[in-house]
C-alpha cells in the first residue's frame, strides 16, 4: 500500500466512473490539485453521501495508488456551503471559481494563497449575494497565485506608467499598454477606461470598489479575455455565468 495523507480540500469536480464509483478532483492547501478514486461512491450513499459534490470543503483520507491517482478512503464535510446552493447566481459563480482554479493550476503544485482565496470566496457566496466585483477580485487573485497577474500599474510592453492618456489592455501582452505602445498594440488589444483601470488596481491592492454596471461589464470582458488567452479556451462554466449575469447584485 502506498503513502497515506489526510488533507483539507475543496471538491473541484466529481465525475461518475462506471456504475459504482467516482473520480473526484480535489484542491488541497498542502498538495495542490489531485485526482482521487472513490470506490463505491455511487452505489453506497452510506460511505460518502453528498460529501463529493463540487465546491464542498472536506477532510479527506487518501492513499496513493500509483501514478497520479489517489484512493479516497474516507471523507467528511467540513463546510458544505449549503446556502449558496439554493441560488442560481451564486451557483454559477461558485462553479466558475472552481473550474477556473482547476484549469489554472497543475497537479501536485501547492498554491496556499489560491486555496485560501477559493475557500474565502465560497464562504462569501455562502453568506451573501453574488456580487460581480467580488468575482473580479477572485479572478485577479487566482491569476496572481498562478503567476499570471496582469500588469496594471506599468505598461506591459515598455514598463513605463500608462499616464493619463487613452490606454489599452492587451491580454496577449499581459496587461495595460501606455498610449504610445497601445497605438501599435496587437489585434486583441482593447480600450480600457480610466475608471475600470482604477477599479482593477484597487482590487489588486485589496481595496474596495465603487463602480457602475458599465464599468462592471467592461472589467468582466477584460479579465475574461485575459483568462481565455492564458488557458487557450473558454471555460464551460462561463456560459452559465453569462446567462445569469443580470441576476448578480
Task: Please provide the spans of the model-predicted regions.
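Non-catalytic alpha-helical scaffolds and adjoining flexible linkers that form interface surfaces
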Residues: 1-249
Amino acid at each position: 500500500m502506498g503513502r497515506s495523507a489526510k488533507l483539507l480540500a475543496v471538491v473541484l469536480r466529481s465525475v461518475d466512473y462506471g456504475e459504482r464509483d467516482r473520480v473526484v478532483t480535489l484542491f488541497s492547501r498542502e498538495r495542490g490539485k489531485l485526482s482521487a478514486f472513490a470506490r463505491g461512491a455511487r452505489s453506497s450513499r452510506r460511505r460518502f453521501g453528498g460529501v463529493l459534490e463540487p465546491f464542498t470543503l472536506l477532510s479527506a483520507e487518501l492513499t496513493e495508488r500509483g501514478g497520479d491517482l489517489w484512493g479516497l478512503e474516507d471523507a467528511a464535510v467540513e463546510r458544505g456551503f449549503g446556502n449558496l446552493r439554493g441560488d442560481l447566481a451564486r451557483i454559477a459563480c461558485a462553479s466558475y471559481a472552481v473550474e477556473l482554479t482547476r484549469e489554472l493550476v497543475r497537479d501536485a503544485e501547492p498554491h496556499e494563497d489560491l486555496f485560501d482565496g477559493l475557500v474565502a470566496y465560497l464562504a462569501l457566496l455562502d453568506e451573501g449575494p453574488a456580487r460581480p466585483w467580488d468575482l473580479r477580485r477572485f479572478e485577479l487573485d487566482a491569476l496572481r497565485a498562478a503567476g499570471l497577474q496582469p500588469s496594471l500599474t506599468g505598461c506591459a510592453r515598455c514598463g513605463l506608467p500608462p499616464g493619463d492618456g487613452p490606454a489599452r489592455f492587451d491580454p496577449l501582452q499581459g496587461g495595460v499598454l501606455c498610449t504610445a505602445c497601445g497605438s501599435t498594440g496587437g489585434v486583441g488589444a482593447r480600450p480600457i477606461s480610466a475608471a475600470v483601470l482604477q477599479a482593477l488596481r484597487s482590487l489588486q491592492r485589496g481595496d474596495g470598489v465603487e463602480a457602475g454596471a458599465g464599468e462592471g461589464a467592461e472589467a468582466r470582458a477584460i479579465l475574461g479575455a485575459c483568462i481565455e488567452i492564458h488557458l487557450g479556451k473558454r471555460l464551460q462554466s462561463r456560459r452559465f455565468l453569462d446567462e445569469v449575469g443580470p441576476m448578480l447584485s
